[in-house]
């Protein structure tokens, strides 16, 4: 059974955006490892960050409410708005979420690095109110501009696009791709960086079309003043030695001689699964002529149990020279027009 993000934050399913922010603020301060020394604090801190990232994003929250954690992370929520598959993967760094929530600063040092007035320890603060006002932070955790009423807003960096080349055989059968990316991650202080490698796993579904987009939200470089970019992979077909692709159909070009084009022939048509299908051609092969073998193409993306067709085009090879006697025979037997 998947994680209950609402339970992790201690809120009801119908909680407002402000309730979610308030709950994250409370839980993050409670379980921050620099404050909470229990063995479970680090894992709880990470769970709280993941829950906040999902529930504070309208699209992720909608998918989670419908399909749960497995649907959110497995791509059950449909497209990303650009024709690609939306799937969520937590970036794994709760300290980056903590720093981003507070606008790239580290209020943790302010709260827990000194005692409050009157000898009251900061760990005892009531964090359901507005504990940030005295330190220049607004209720949602962003730095407060003293000359403005509302909080500043972080902008997300543009998506980082990569091409992902796949063979027709991989599209035919489906496959798993593991893509290694390198990115910058913020340290806990919210200012310095470290380099990090991560493996992103992509499940290539049967029949996916060229141009399909797979989006990993917020997996790009972290900076103090912006939201990490989405990493986007776009499916591109590899060139194939035998076939061309036409949607869910595939095209095979059969090379035959002029004699075979006029008198008929038998050919073996290869398939994507490694078989050969014998085909007799008894008609005269004319320019643009095609034959069709139904159901031997690629799976349909939305119904992979059904497949497109295998189309056979013909390329007629003409002789470079022909004898005078052969020309005479052709003149006698071939129509003039």
Curated annotation (Swiss-Prot):
| Biological process, per Gene Ontology | chaperone cofactor-dependent protein refolding; negative regulation of transcription by RNA polymerase II; response to heat; response to unfolded protein
Annotated Gene Ontology cellular component terms? cytosol; nucleoplasm; plasma membrane; Z disc
Q: What is its main location?
A: cytoplasm
- The reply on keyword Phosphoprotein is yes
> What InterPro entries does its record include?
DnaJ_C (IPR002939), DnaJ_domain (IPR001623), DnaJ_domain_CS (IPR018253), DnaJ_subfamily_B (IPR051339), HSP40/DnaJ_pept-bd (IPR008971), J_dom_sf (IPR036869)
Quick one: effect of changing residue 61 to G? In CMYO21; uncertain significance
Q: Which UniProt keywords apply?
A: Cell membrane, Chaperone, Cytoplasm, Disease variant, Membrane, Phosphoprotein, Stress response
- Highest taxon above the source species: Eukaryota
Which CDD domains does the protein's record reference? DnaJ (cd06257), DnaJ_C (cd10747)
Q: What does the induction field say?
A: By heat shock.
**Tissue specificity annotation:** Expressed in heart, pancreas and skeletal muscle, and to a lesser extent in brain, placenta and liver.
Q: How does it assemble?
A: Homodimer. The C-terminal section interacts with the C-terminal tail of OPRM1. Also interacts with SDIM1.
Indicate the disease this protein is implicated in.
Congenital myopathy 21 with early respiratory failure: An autosomal recessive muscle disorder characterized by diaphragmatic weakness, respiratory impairment, and spinal rigidity. Disease onset ranges from early childhood to adulthood and severity is variable. Death from respiratory failure may occur in severe cases. Some affected individuals may show developmental delay and hypertrophic cardiomyopathy.
As for what it does, the entry says: Probable chaperone. Stimulates ATP hydrolysis and the folding of unfolded proteins mediated by HSPA1A/B (in vitro).
State the protein's name. Answer: DnaJ homolog subfamily B member 4
Give the species.
Answer: Homo sapiens
Could you tell me the gene encoding this protein?
DNAJB4
